[in-house]
Regions:
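Non-catalytic cap/lid and distal C-terminal segments of serine-dependent acyl enzymes
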Residues: 1-195
């Protein structure tokens, strides 16, 4: 299921739009009601491209009891694990939509969306760690940001799988290849009816 995030960065925004709640509570209930789908943690995954990649990572780290795995493809803005990435984007990225979602740089009320502390805490309860898969194109303009995110996950002690795609950038050519790879190789899909 692909749903519109309206430049919310997949969080409950600073000014009243609860997108994190929508994606992690409301949408799963709708999916369960409309489609033959499993409510079990082991059968629930989240995948995102670009801003959605950071959203996917955030969902899995904040709701590890519901999402067993997350795939972050080219995620380089929004919810961040790396403290430097997070503070720099809040100060320097000239995007009104970023401010509309997170609030202004001096606003510290978005603590749940700063993921390093959460990632570190999750390592203390390894029985609920989600499987994490991160990939970025070698020529992606946000590759260095993604590398800092990778390094922050390592510092936090979270296990994950990381790949860089040679010759590819922030583009559908990369996402098509790696979304297929996620479905065929990374995610533990059962590939059988659940009804």
């Amino acid at each position: 299921v692909c749903a519109q995030a309206c430049d919310s960065f997949y969080i409950d925004t600073a000014y009243g739009f609860p997108f994190f709640q929508f994606f992690t509570e409301e949408l799963p209930r709708v999916v369960q009601a409309l489609f033959a789908s499993s409510p079990l943690r082991e059968d629930n995954f989240v995948v995102g491209f670009a801003m959605g990649g950071n959203g996917a990572l955030s969902f899995a780290l904040r709701k590890p009891d519901f999402f067993s795995a997350a795939v972050n493809l080219s995620g380089g803005i929004g919810c961040m694990v790396d403290e430097f990435n997070y503070s720099q984007q809040m100060k320097e990225v000239p995007m009104p939509r970023l401010r509309h979602a997170f609030g202004y740089p001096n606003r510290n009320a978005v603590e749940p969306d700063h993921l390093f502390k959460l990632a570190t805490q999750l390592c203390q309860t390894p029985h609920i760690l989600p499987s994490l898969y991160i990939a970025v194109g070698e020529n992606d303009f946000i590759r260095n940001t993604v590398r800092r995110e990778r390094d922050a996950l390592q510092r936090a002690g979270l296990p994950f799988h990381y790949e860089e795609a040679p010759g590819l950038g922030h583009e559908w050519k990369f996402w098509d290849i790696y979304f297929k790879k996620a479905l065929e190789e990374w995610l533990p899909l059962k590939r059988k009816p659940i009804y």
